[in-house]
Amino acid sequence: APILFGSSFMKEGDFQLMGVFGGTSFLGLTWIGEVDIAENWVDDNSSLASFSEFSYPVKQGLHFVVRYDLFDEDINIKNNAISRWTVGADVFPLSFFEIKLQGRFTSLSGDGENPEPEYLIQFHTWF
């Protein structure tokens, strides 16, 4: 199974961003993920952002996708993170054309009320 792993770093003034990313594929199931820590992006806080995605080609032109995203604007404060599960399908009916069908389910940590689910249809083309 092919494996990809890497890291990134950026510093500009007081702002600093560093992260790791990776991915692998086995028997058609593909995983990609990334974790980043930012210093001084939101005020003077240390922030954390991450995502993890699994994709599986059911047949040519149809992929099922499950993704988890997390953003914590201040890792030193408990219960201030936003997380989201995304479930959907990527349909490729023609070359260079994609239709994304997704349901997004967002959760706020702490005692806050969670937002209603979001449903997305996106048309995407490239060249």
Regions found by a protein language model. Name each.
Residues 10-41:
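Oxyanion-binding "anion nests"
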Residues 23-28, 56-60, 91-97, 127:
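Outer-membrane beta-barrel strand-turn architecture
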Residues 2-5, 28-33, 61-64, 95-101:
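Repeated loop/turn-to-beta-strand initiation elements of outer-membrane beta-barrel proteins
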Residues 11-15, 39-43, 72-76, 107-111:
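Gram-negative outer-membrane beta-barrel proteins
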Residues 115-127:
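Outer-membrane beta-barrel "beta-signal"
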Residues 17, 47-49, 84-86, 118-120:
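Transmembrane beta-barrel architecture of outer-membrane proteins
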Residues 5-11, 33-37, 52, 66-70, ...:
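Transmembrane beta-barrel strands of outer-membrane/channel proteins
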Residues 21-23, 53, 88, 102, ...:
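Outer-membrane beta-barrel architecture
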